[in-house]
Amino acid sequence: MTEDKKNQLLNEIAGYFSPTVRHLISLLPGKAVGEMSEIRLRAGQPLSLTVKGENVFLSDGGQLCYLLQSGLYTVTKKDINDTFRALCEFSEYAYKDQLKMGYIPLKNGCRAGIAARAVIENGKMVGIAEVSSINIRLAVEYINCAIPLSKYFSGGLLIAGPPGSGPGQPGGPHLHHVLRWP
């Protein structure tokens, strides 16, 4: 994915973050943004990112740091709660089923993994409480990944699935590549 596309993607998801985290991420250099694949918020721990496959941290001033050190921004419970509410569009109930699976799919192909305490009633998980961390995986574009399949479906292809299993769901990016075939 190009740096411009990654910047656009990051701008789209920026609204989910608490104001402080949003500001720190906005300070990242473009090259780091283009190579970023995850953003991790863990209550009481440094804000961390995966950039070029490496775990890095953000300082209080928005600088990338490759080692644990003083001056790193520590994610607060408020950061977690603000981000979680925004990810759920301020209606946790509307995302009850997704939360039981441990993640929220986002509209742009990203997904947010949620770590929390499970709420169990009569032996069944009915929800979550006390969110302690959020891991946002940024969508990745794989150009031409569906080309090897084209020889099998040259006469046409009907793709069907249950309701809610379309392009906005996990695996959906592969469907987009199939749809772009000439």
Language-model regions, residue ranges each:
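Glycine-rich phosphate-binding P-loop
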Residues: 153-174
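N-terminal accessory targeting/assembly segments
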Residues: 1-108
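Short amphipathic C-terminal alpha-helix that caps PH/PH-like domains
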Residues: 130, 174-175
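N-terminal start-of-domain structural block
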Residues: 61-85, 123, 137-154, 160
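Short, ordered loop/turn segments at secondary-structure junctions
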Residues: 43-44, 141, 164
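P-loop NTP-binding catalytic core
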Residues: 90-154
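Post-Walker A helix-loop "phosphate-sensing" segment adjacent to the P-loop in P-loop NTPases
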Residues: 176-182
